[in-house]
Amino acid sequence: MASQGEHALLGHSTVQPSERGKDSPVPYSPRASRAKNTPGQFPDPIIVSPHQEHKQTFIILHGRGSTAEKFAPPLLSITTPSGETLQTAFPHAKLIFLTASRNRATIYKRSLTHQWFDHWHMEAPSKRQELMRAGLRKSAGYVHGILEREIEEVGEENVVLWGLSQGCATSLIALLTWNGGPFAATVGMCGYLPFANHIEDIVKGGSEGDGDDVFGEDERDNDDNPFCNSGDENDSSNGFENNRITKQDLPTQAVTFLRDEIEMGDKAGMVFRDVPVFMGHGTEDEKVPIEMGREARTCLDLLGADVQMVEYEGLGHWYSEEMLGDMFDFLREKLCISQ
């Protein structure tokens, strides 16, 4: 694997394509790209300029505990079975590698780490789901802002949202809560969908998934929550007897639930149905079990999303040459790029 200094990587100030040859790497600038480690704040993204005229933008999110500075170099260096890299396959794409803010992680004794949101152990994804709310709201809002800016620059049909692991989970939440125009595609590696158990149950006509408390112990008696079952069973303001909810179709109810849960308002748009999704997942993933990826795909299917998932035999919690090759083919099709 090549060293970081060999990759086309810069911080906020990028080298323009005219300053180098078509296939020459941008010099790596550690000083320019070093993430600011102020807790709770998003560091400046690392931006990789396109090799040719800027026509597309890829917004890329790393996994929990990583940063853009760590995540970008290996992704830029890996080659597909046909010998392509991300930059040679998409020479017109600006690559924006985002870095999550540093926040306290509950399962790591509240130590500070870069994470898009806090969560409980992956072995029990339906437990302590209230931990995810604040981070998902903040991170999805941050991603929405980047999407808006890049769509304004190159057009919605030329913007891609991409994430690994927790970055994939955040990308999917950002997609489901997006109320702008449909962008080109979302791609995820080794990912999962937060609140998947509750979303699936709502779409299937249930009320609260498998019985686990989505809101946390301190909110079990919250009468203001339309999804809470703790009130009077004859009170039409509780559960799915609420008129505002029962007038909606089930997928819209699920998206409304998601938006309510992370406090993003109740304007439940369904734009995500017009944004194709590709998910790649290794069958031997030791951190995000493939069952969680399958659950995410099932939920997206039930919500009416255009989703495809490819499983990679023997692959652990990472991506492979084959996965990247499949993703490149998918993106070429959605971006209407011929090889």
Language model: regions and residue ranges:
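Active-site signature of alpha/beta-hydrolase-fold catalytic machinery across serine-
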Residues: 173-177
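N-terminal cap/lid segment of alpha/beta-hydrolase-fold proteins
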Residues: 2-51, 56, 133-139, 223-253
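The feature captures the conserved acid-bearing segment of alpha/beta-hydrolase catalytic domains
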Residues: 49-52, 180, 185, 191-337
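Gly/Ala-rich beta-loop-alpha elbow adjacent to hydrolase catalytic centers
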Residues: 162-167, 171
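Serine-hydrolase catalytic machinery in alpha/beta-hydrolase-like enzymes
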Residues: 31-158
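Residue in the alpha/beta-hydrolase core beta-strand immediately N-terminal to the catalytic nucleophile
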Residues: 158-160, 185-187
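Short hydrophobic segments within beta-strands
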Residues: 59-61, 98, 162, 189, ...
